[in-house]
Regions:
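N-terminal strand-loop-strand beta-hairpin
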Residues: 1, 15, 30-62
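N-terminal beta-strand motif that seeds the catalytic metal site of vicinal oxygen chelate
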Residues: 1-21, 91-100, 160-165
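Vicinal oxygen chelate
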Residues: 1-3, 15, 19-22, 30, 34-35, 62-65, 68-71, 108-165, ...
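A cross-kingdom feature marking solvent-exposed beta-strand/loop segments within repeated
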Residues: 37-54, 76-88, 93, 128-132, ...
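Histidine- and/or cysteine-centered catalytic micro-motif in compact active-site loops
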Residues: 41, 72-74, 101
């Protein structure tokens, strides 16, 4: 069971796109989000072991909610690309994001909640500063949940970089 306290950190809506530039344009035209902090990400996963994914990621805030655009570009990206379905779909809803506050021990305690009813389909780390895991909630909710933890330094760096609208 994932405890209700996990959702106190609900802060993100994640979307997958075939074309991040076109998705950015769509979000600007229709939702007033005029800029995204974009970067390329390559991560080697802990689960599934050795899996590598390459993504272009864009982040922006709409009020207190972070909007994430993800363009899969290489490696094992089925977890992301599968939500697009129709060839003409530009953007597909992928996940809600939950930020785990506190130190690394808080992440480890949070991580212990996951069980077979909430399988981890992707998990990884970036050095000592980032931990993330996606649980598959599609049978009940129709989407994934991304659980993420940042060191205080990483969180501060990101906050400075991500535009707010």
């Amino acid at each position: 069971m994932i405890l209700p306290t996990a959702y106190t950190g609900l802060n993100q809506l994640g979307y997958v796109t075939r074309d991040i530039e076109e998705a950015r344009s769509t979000f600007e035209r229709h939702y007033g989000i005029a800029d995204f902090f974009c970067f390329e990400a390559r991560t080697e996963a802990i689960i599934p072991k050795g899996s590598v994914n390459e993504l272009i990621v864009g982040l922006a805030y709409a009020g207190d909610i972070q909007v994430e655009l993800i363009q899969p570009v290489g490696g094992d990206v089925g977890l992301y690309a599968d939500v697009l379905g129709e060839p003409q779909a530009l953007v597909g809803f992928h996940h809600v994001g939950v930020m785990v506050a506190g130190n690394l021990d808080a992440w480890n305690r949070h991580r212990q909640q996951f069980d077979p009813a909430h399988p981890v389909v992707l998990e990884g780390a970036v050095g000592d500063d980032i931990r993330f895991a996606f649980t598959d909630e599609r049978p009940r909710l129709g989407h994934y949940i991304e659980h993420v933890w940042f060191s205080a330094r990483q969180a501060a760096d990101l906050e400075e970089s991500i535009p707010r609208f």
